[in-house]
């Protein structure tokens, strides 16, 4: 990243005062989140996904923010409907989904109170061939392991596509916050 002109900073953002030492930024791509391995430490999920987000939102309230979110804050919908749209009411189920909505609400707060331009970037699974759902299924096929097919559909987009779209979203950020579902146009089973 340094060779590309990206200035990196290593910090434990949960430590008091650390956020104040970070430089101002015109644009913030907010990708902080705790998802996997949170069973038994749900307090940590809430701390990182909501409390820390509130601190970061306050610190960078003068920036344009693209905040990664998740489509799992939507209810399950029949496959034939094409899935949730940005107008679909949220119905988070479970600790992670609730904290994901909490993260959005922290950015909604600064967008509404301070005029911060925010885009809530909702996606489910960004995949590529080295990891993710495609890799998991391919590995099971290769190893002859059983594949759980109880969930017949999943919302997946290519990781490279997600990166390109996310960087273009700074120009779409608004106050109040804008929502963008990032998903493919077709349903494949």
Residue ranges, per PLM feature:
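Active-site helix of classical SDR
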Residues: 95, 99-102
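SDR active-site strand-loop-helix element
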Residues: 28-32, 65-71, 121-123
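NAD(P)H-binding glycine-rich loop region in Rossmannoid oxidoreductase-like domains
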Residues: 3-48
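Mid/C-terminal beta-alpha module of Rossmann-like enzyme folds, strongest
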Residues: 165-189
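Conserved cofactor-binding/catalytic machinery of classical short-chain dehydrogenase/reductase
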Residues: 48-52, 64, 102-103, 158-161
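Hydrophobic positions on the long internal alpha-helix
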Residues: 52-60, 106-107, 165
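Conserved Rossmann-fold NAD(P)-dependent oxidoreductase catalytic core, especially the SDR/UDP-sugar
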Residues: 54-95
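NAD(P)-dependent short-chain dehydrogenase/reductase
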Residues: 105-161, 167
């Amino acid at each position: 990243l340094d060779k590309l002109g990206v200035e990196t900073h290593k910090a434990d953002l949960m430590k008091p005062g650390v956020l104040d030492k970070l430089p101002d930024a015109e644009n913030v791509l907010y990708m902080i989140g705790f998802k996997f391995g949170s069973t038994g430490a749900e307090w940590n999920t809430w701390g990182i996904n909501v409390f820390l987000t509130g601190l970061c939102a306050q610190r960078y309230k003068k920036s344009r923010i693209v905040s990664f979110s998740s489509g799992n804050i939507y209810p399950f919908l029949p496959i034939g409907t094409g899935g949730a749209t940005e107008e679909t009411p949220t119905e988070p189920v479970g600790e992670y989904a609730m904290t994901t909505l909490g993260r959005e609400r922290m950015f909604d707060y600064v967008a509404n109170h301070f005029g911060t331009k925010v885009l809530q970037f909702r996606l489910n699974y960004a995949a590529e061939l080295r990891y993710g759902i495609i890799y998991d299924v391919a590995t099971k096929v290769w190893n002859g392991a059983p594949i759980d097919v109880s969930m017949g559909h999943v919302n997946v987009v290519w990781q490279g596509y997600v990166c390109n779209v996310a960087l273009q979203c700074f120009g779409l950020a608004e106050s109040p916050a804008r929502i963008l579902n990032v998903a493919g146009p077709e349903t494949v089973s």
